[in-house]
């Protein structure tokens, strides 16, 4: 199991959304805007059939939502925040990698979104990928957490636009597949 830019301890932006949007007078407008953003990003990524439910996503991505998920599925959880967890539990290997950086490519329209979410979120000064704090991205054995990519770059979304001066996201996935092959998995 590999967590890539995972919200393993929640997202500071989601926490901000829970505190300032959900249940408030802007909930409907915010939900419509976030659903539209999700629909556009899905379409640009070639997945227009995916449905968006922004409010449920915000709740799930919040610290409280992530904690509930982690309590149900704790294998690989780091022993300390920003630490490593077990990389083998019950025959399952646990790894993670993550990134930092909000502005990564001048042609990437998601950069503006991540500058905003980074500014609004509760991150306590921690570096982020625009949506998730660096240490929240760790799970199991952390391979790397300092790639200069935003949250979408890490999964090579939006036409594969990512930082031209950084490791290509596809290279990270290939290297990880090679790691598994070399382990006989």
For every predicted segment, state its role:
Residues 2-185:
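Helical cap/lid subdomain of alpha/beta-hydrolase-fold lipid enzymes
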């Amino acid at each position: 199991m590999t967590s890539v830019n995972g919200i393993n301890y929640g997202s500071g932006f989601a926490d901000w959304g829970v505190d300032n949007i959900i249940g408030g007078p802007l909930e409907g407008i915010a939900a419509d805007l976030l659903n539209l953003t999700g629909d556009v990003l899905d379409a640009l990524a070639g997945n227009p059939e995916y449905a968006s439910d922004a409010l449920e996503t915000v709740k799930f991505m919040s610290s409280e939502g992530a904690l509930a998920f982690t309590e149900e599925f704790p294998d690989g959880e780091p022993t300390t925040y920003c630490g490593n967890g077990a990389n083998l539990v019950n025959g399952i290997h646990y790894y993670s990698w993550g990134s930092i950086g909000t502005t990564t490519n001048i042609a990437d329209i998601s950069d503006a979104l991540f500058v905003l979410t980074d500014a609004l979120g509760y991150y306590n000064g921690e570096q982020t990928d625009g949506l998730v704090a660096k240490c929240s991205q760790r799970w199991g054995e952390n391979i790397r957490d300092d790639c200069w990519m935003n949250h979408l770059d890490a999964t090579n979304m939006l036409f594969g636009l990512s930082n031209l001066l950084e490791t290509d996201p596809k290279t990270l996935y290939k290297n990880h597949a090679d790691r598994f092959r070399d382990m006989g998995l």
